[in-house]
A protein has these predicted regions:
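Intrinsically disordered, low-complexity, mixed-charge
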Residues: 1-182, 186, 193
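Internal gly/pro-rich beta-alpha loop/helix module
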Residues: 66, 169, 323, 327-402, ...
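A phosphate-binding glycine/aspartate-rich beta-alpha loop in the early core of alpha/beta enzymes
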Residues: 80, 163, 225-288
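A contiguous, well-structured pocket-lining segment that forms one wall/lid of small-molecule binding clefts
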Residues: 182, 189-190, 413-451, 563-720, ...
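Short glycine-rich phosphate-binding loop at a beta-alpha junction
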Residues: 219, 457-469, 717-728
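Conserved phosphate-binding catalytic cores of ATP/NTP-utilizing and phosphoryl-transfer enzymes
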Residues: 263-268, 317, 343-348, 374-375, ...
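Conserved phosphate-binding/catalytic loops in two-lobed NTP-binding clefts
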Residues: 466, 481-493, 720-723, 732, ...
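Glycine-rich phosphate-binding/hydrolytic loop that grips phosphoryl groups
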Residues: 491-512, 516-518, 557-566, 750-776
């Protein structure tokens, strides 16, 4: 070793696999005259750097200031080992990956980068129109991964040996594909083909484009599974897809050719554009323009539409190719599955599940190891507000400052299922799995849990599930063979909000959603909790009502409306007069509901805030039934928002209600007087007052009730932090009105940002509870 030379061992932790980290290290080392090695150890990248103190300092500074675009460096540990080594390095080398134990971070799938896009459409480039073009900065990661460290032989690309040209790029540090594990080209990479037809490669893409142009439906395999695709400007084919999918009203996601098309169709803020065009490319819920070209049946009676940009090369090629076919610049791109089932990822699944839904299926022979549905994101206060966290975001971990040790698996909720693995203070939420009412989704959950345990090298000390004894998620947890910890649904919601915000103080939790199994065996869903990681107390709830008719009541808000009206009138004749005036149901239907209520037939006590919204939507004549989850409550929100927008100058934020009538106290808990609110809304509607105004008033008074309950909880407990969670808080109007009032009253408000407030986010709360229990 030369005089003044030092040798340092440097370990870099974070998302440093599958993002071109080692090639970047090598380039920085060369630029600063550093000799040594870089090696992928799995949990971290290890660097041996030899040079003068000035050279090493410059190298480290470059590494910190200019990491790869997609990397997330969480920490860098350095150690001067000059006194412990006599090794003299002659150059700087990337050496073969080695497996070691430690913190593991897995890269998410990354949308095609601008450089690859430019190459793909350059006729002079050897990857011209290549459907699987990628580089160190972009391409599939999680969805092709078999095991760590992230190297080609541990991905589904191991089946495609590199050609000499690709191998040359792979080993040349001057190229963008230096050490890019999925690197391939038209000669050596995967191929696209039509299932059940002879066309492959270019012919298959041209055939697909022609069908779509002619108004047909095609299933297309992407990065995380199949999509069903058709012309989003063609009313006839969109209606046909709705009929085939048995999806009468739920909005379809749309893929636009580029951001200029999105701006033509939707209102896009600069902050939204940054997410839309970024490397994760979620579906963004955007406000539609009235003069857009989308078929009305894409998102019926909805002021918003979910839009994304192409993130896989093959999707770009559907829009643009050299075959002379003029394509629409907007395509429906909805998950390739039948109702209730997980997204299809294999040809056999697609043939079985999608054949009757489409006219052709464009697939490819790069295997998908883990399904990844598209991420869905809204915006609130000009910030991302996650609705479904999946492709591009999972499995990026959430880290807390808690000094927790252990390993847990949380299986998540029954609906919108995701699971979460906790390792010490790190929590890895899975991609979206789906609703576990379907046994195919249960199987997908079991498969994905097994693969995640393998990738993260985890053997849980406990598995955490919901309290409900008959949920399929509970059965999955029990069958895994680990000790089972059960946690109440709404408590898990609040813990998920606390964990995302890294809050370790006791909080007042407001959990508003559609349903959850309560500790008393009734249906909960409009809850005020006093919570910390160790336990919770039910401090308050909305007014209980009878939820009659089982599953039907979740889809038919008129049933809940009848129950509530009968509940406060306590008189069949008067109740029927109101129902008849409002057109809620037939006289025969009302008699059945009255009898069920009187005799408690198929009737369960409920405090579901979701059903409260459905009932008010029915009473106001907005939606009496929901064709999909949340349709009635979302329509109520849209009516209220439209009224607010049109009457901004006339709306007073000052609340006139006497605080004493917003709440009343029972021997069990405080009760938000939502029965009184429903009665007031009903009577006002019968007087002919404006529907939009009443929809807004409902939101306004409910926010005031929540605030009053939190004030009582603060007086009782001394807590001044409020956590807002549950699917009802996807309603941005209620969230804003509630947050504003709480802030006015001096509360610190915790809310979700990158974890969904709905059931897709509760697994991280379950995992945090389980981890806390392990510390005892």
């Amino acid at each position: 070793m030369y005089k003044n030379e030092m040798t340092w061992r440097i370990r870099v932790y974070g998302i440093v696999q599958g993002v071109g980290f080692r090639p970047t290290v090598s380039r920085h080392a060369t630029n600063h005259g550093i000799y040594g090695t870089v090696c992928n150890k799995g949990p971290y990248v290890e660097i041996y750097a030899q040079g003068t103190k000035e050279q090493i300092d410059g190298f480290l500074n470059s590494l910190k200031e200019h990491p790869p675009k997609r990397a997330a460096v969480l920490k860098i540990n350095t150690e001067d080992i000059t006194a412990d080594t006599t090794e003299q390095f002659e150059q700087f080398d990337i050496i073969e990956s080695e497996k070691t134990k430690g913190e593991i971070f897995i890269s998410q799938d990354i949308a095609i980068c601008d450089e690859c896009k430019a190459e793909m459409f350059d006729p002079k480039d050897r990857r011209y129109l290549h459907p699987f073009i990628n580089c160190t900065c972009c391409g599939p990661r999680l969805t092709i991964l078999d095991a760590l460290p992230y190297d080609r032989e541990r991905t589904s690309m191991k089946e495609f040996p590199m050609c000499p040209d690709c191998a040359k790029e792979y080993t040349d540090e001057k190229t963008r594909r230096y050490d890019a594990q999925p690197v391939c080209c038209n000669q050596c990479g995967p191929q696209v083909y039509l299932i059940g037809r002879p066309e492959r490669g270019r012919a298959a893409i041209t055939y697909t484009r022609r069908l779509i142009r002619e108004g047909k439906i095609v299933a297309i395999k992407g990065i995380g599974g199949f999509h069903l695709c058709c012309d989003a400007t063609n009313e006839e084919v969109v209606c046909r897809l709705r009929t085939l999918k048995n999806r009468p009203a739920k909005p379809f996601a749309v893929m636009a050719k580029d951001e200029s098309v999105v701006k033509r169709e939707c209102v896009v803020t600069p902050e939204q554009e940054a997410i839309l065009t970024g490397h994760q490319k979620p579906i963004l819920l955007l406000d539609r323009r009235s003069d857009g070209g989308l078929a009305s049946s894409v998102a019926p009676n909805n002021p918003k539409v979910g839009v994304m940009l192409p993130y896989a090369p093959v999707q770009l090629l559907i829009f643009q190719y050299d075959d002379g076919i003029e394509m629409p610049d907007l395509l429906v791109m909805t998950s390739g599955n039948t109702s209730g089932a997980p997204i299809c990822r294999e040809d056999e699944e697609a043939v079985a599940e999608l054949s009757h839904l489409c006219d052709a299926m464009l697939s490819h022979n790069r295997k998908i190891r883990i399904r990844a549905d598209d991420t869905v994101m809204d915006f609130y206060r000009n910030e991302p507000y996650m609705i479904r966290r999946s492709r591009g975001y999972a499995p990026l971990p959430f880290m807390t400052k808690a000094d927790w040790k252990g390993q847990v698996l949380a299986v998540g909720g029954e609906l919108k299922n995701t699971f979460c693995i906790g390792v010490d203070n790190r929590f890895y939420p899975s991609p979206y799995v789906g609703d576990l009412e379907d046994l195919r989704t249960v199987k997908a959950l079991q498969e994905t849990i097994h693969r995640f345990q393998t990738l993260l090298e985890v053997k849980p000390q406990a598995v955490v599930c919901d309290l409900h004894p008959k949920y399929n998620s509970t059965v999955v947890a029990e069958e895994l063979g680990y000790p089972v910890i059960r946690v109440q649904h709404h408590y898990a919601h609040i813990l998920s909000c606390m964990t995302e915000n890294d809050c370790h103080d006791p909080v007042i939790g407001v959990a508003f959603d559609g349903t959850g199994y309560g500790t008393d065996g009734t249906i909960w869903g409009g809850e005020i909790l006093l919570a910390d990681y160790g336990n919770f107390t039910r401090f308050g709830s909305i007014t209980p009502f009878l939820q009659m008719g089982g599953d039907a009541s979740a889809k038919e808000g008129w049933r809940i409306a009848v129950s509530m009206i009968y509940g406060y009138t306590k008189d069949r004749k008067r109740a029927w007069e109101i129902m008849e005036t409002l057109g809620l149901c037939s006289e025969q239907e009302s008699r059945v509901q009255f009898t069920m209520a009187d005799r408690k037939i198929n009737a369960v006590a409920s405090t579901s805030a979701g059903r409260l919204f459905d009932a008010v939507s029915a009473i106001l004549g907005i939606r009496r039934r929901s064709g999909f989850e949340g349709e009635a409550s979302t329509a109520l929100q849209f009516a209220a928002e439209a009224y607010e927008q049109q009457n901004l100058s006339n709306i007073s934020q000052e609340q006139k209600e006497n605080k004493d009538i917003l709440l009343h106290e029972t021997k069990e808990r405080f009760v938000l007087n939502t029965q009184m609110l429903v009665q007031q809304i009903t009577e006002a509607k019968m007087r002919g007052e404006d529907t939009g105004m009443l929809a807004y008033r409902f939101h306004q008074v409910l926010a005031e009730m929540i605030t009053a309950a939190c004030i009582k909880a603060k007086e009782s407990s001394g807590r001044d932090k409020v956590a807002l969670s549950g699917g009802v808080f996807q309603n941005r109007l209620l969230l804003r009105l509630t947050e504003e009032r709480l802030l006015q009253e001096g509360f610190e408000v915790l809310r979700h940002r990158m974890i969904p407030p709905n059931d897709g986010g509760i697994a991280i709360g379950q995992a945090a509870y389980g981890m806390y229990q392990l510390q005892k």
